Design a protein with these regions (language model features):
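Oligomerization/assembly interface segments of phage tail-like spikes and tubes
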Residues: 68-78, 151-165, 192, 206-217
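Short, solvent-exposed secondary-structure boundary/capping segments
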Residues: 68-72, 101-116, 194-216
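Long terminal accessory segments
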Residues: 3-7, 14, 191-261
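Surface-exposed beta-loop interaction hotspot
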Residues: 93-165
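Active-site-proximal polar cores
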Residues: 1-48, 115-131
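Short beta-strand-centered aromatic/proline hotspots
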Residues: 55-57, 87, 93-103, 177, ...
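Short coil-to-beta transition motif at edge beta-strands of beta-rich domains
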Residues: 39, 78-90, 166-184
Length: 261
C-alpha cells in the first residue's frame, strides 16, 4: 500500500543508491562499531615502529575449534582503514593483514594471521638491529629450494616467515641468517633459502614470504640479543651493491584506496 512506503527496503537501482550506501555506512559506523561487539585496534602500517592509528573494528572467528584456524581472523573496518601488510595490535597481540583487502561500499574486509613470534635481525637498509612481529609456520613439508642431498645431510627443518612488505624487508636474500628460538642458551640458526616479494603484492603493499632452513650456530652470533652474525654476508654483497637504493614501497600507516564509483 502507498501508505506503507516507509517500510520498503532501500532501492539501490532507483537512482538514489549513493545516498542509500552512505546511510548504510553510517549505520555500520555509528551502530555496530560503537557496540561491545567491536574491538579497539591499533594500526601500525607496514613498520612496527610507526605511530599507531586507533580505530574500532569487528574481529570475527574468535572462537575456533580447528587448530589450523585458531591463528586466523577476519576483520571488518570502515572503508580504507587497512591494507595488506599492515601490522595490527589487538588486545596486546600482534596480527598481520595477509590478504588483499577487499571492500564493498559499506566496509573493508581483510584476513589476519597471528604474529606468533618476534624476530631480531640486522636491517639491510640501515644495518642497525630491528625487531619485527612475524608469522612463522613450520614448513618442513614444503620445497625449500635447497638441493635434496644438501637438505638430507645438513638440514633438519625449515620455516616459512611472513613479513610486512617495506623497503627494509624486500632486501632479504638467499643465505641471509636469523637466530630464532625460545631456547636462548642454545638457539637455532636459520638461513634464507627463498624469498617471495611478488606473490602478495597488492598496489605496492603486501607481504614478503621467506623460506628459511636450519643452519649452524656460529661463535660470532649474538646469542644474548638473538641477532645472527651476517657480517660475511654483508661483506660479500657489499653495502653499496644496491642494498641502500631500492625501489620505494609506499610507507603505509594503515589505510588505502577507497573506490566510490
Amino acid at each position: 500500500m502507498a501508505t506503507e512506503w516507509y517500510l520498503m527496503e532501500p532501492d539501490v537501482l532507483g537512482g538514489f543508491e549513493n545516498t542509500e550506501f552512505r546511510n548504510w555506512r553510517g549505520a555500520f559506523k555509528n551502530s555496530i562499531l560503537t557496540t561491545d561487539f567491536a574491538r579497539t585496534v591499533d594500526i601500525y602500517g607496514n613498520y612496527p615502529t610507526n605511530k599507531p592509528k586507533r580505530i574500532r573494528a569487528l574481529v570475527l572467528d574468535q572462537v575456533e575449534n580447528s587448530y589450523n584456524k585458531m591463528k586466523e581472523r577476519q576483520i571488518l573496518t570502515e572503508l580504507g582503514q587497512i591494507q595488506c601488510g599492515d601490522l595490527l595490535l589487538i588486545d596486546g597481540r600482534w596480527w598481520l593483514v595477509i590478504s588483499l583487502v577487499d571492500q564493498n561500499r559499506l566496509y573493508s574486509k581483510g584476513i589476519l594471521y597471528y604474529c606468533n613470534s618476534v624476530l631480531n635481525f640486522t636491517s639491510l637498509k640501515t644495518f642497525n638491529t630491528v625487531s619485527y612481529p612475524v608469522v612463522v609456520h613450520n614448513a618442513t613439508q614444503y620445497n625449500s629450494g635447497e638441493r635434496a642431498t644438501d637438505y638430507m645431510v645438513t638440514l633438519s627443518s625449515q620455516r616459512l616467515y611472513y613479513f610486512p612488505a617495506n623497503d627494509e624487508t624486500i632486501l632479504f636474500d638467499n643465505d641471509y641468517r636469523f637466530l630464532h628460538d625460545r631456547n636462548k642458551l642454545h638457539p637455532s640458526a636459520w638461513k634464507i633459502a627463498q624469498v617471495d616479494t611478488e606473490n602478495d603484492d597488492w598496489d605496492g603493499y603486501g607481504i614478503v614470504r621467506v623460506m628459511a632452513v636450519e643452519d649452524e650456530l656460529l661463535m660470532t652470533d649474538d646469542v644474548e640479543n638473538m641477532v645472527a652474525d651476517n657480517s660475511k654476508w654483508i661483506e660479500k654483497h657489499g653495502k653499496n651493491s644496491g642494498y641502500q637504493s631500492v625501489e620505494d614501497i609506499p610507507p603505509s600507516d594503515g589505510g588505502g584506496w577507497i573506490d566510490m564509483t
